[in-house]
């Protein structure tokens, strides 16, 4: 799958083997985080295209157009405001 980062103007390949947050860090793209488990909401970003899911609904409050990088499961190519 492909992850397009709008503000970085770059696209990364992604295979769900790690969290999206970990994958971004491995590619030297850093974003704020704290808990890494869906509790705090620090890693939320806007999703513009595509679909994600969660194994368990995160406790952090998110809007329908937001995802948590630390715990989302990418279901398709996505475009995020990052």
From Swiss-Prot:
Pfam families: Fer2 (PF00111). SUPFAM superfamilies: 2Fe-2S ferredoxin-like. Its cofactor is [2Fe-2S] cluster. The keyword Electron transport applies. InterPro entries: 2Fe-2S_ferredoxin-like_sf, 2Fe-2S_ferredoxin-type, 2Fe2S_fd_BS, Beta-grasp_dom_sf. [2Fe-2S] cluster binds at residues 35, 40, 43, 72. Keywords: 2Fe-2S, Electron transport, Iron, Iron-sulfur, Metal-binding, Transport. This is Uncharacterized ferredoxin-like protein HI_1309. The lineage of its organism: Bacteria, Pseudomonadati, Pseudomonadota, Gammaproteobacteria, Pasteurellales.
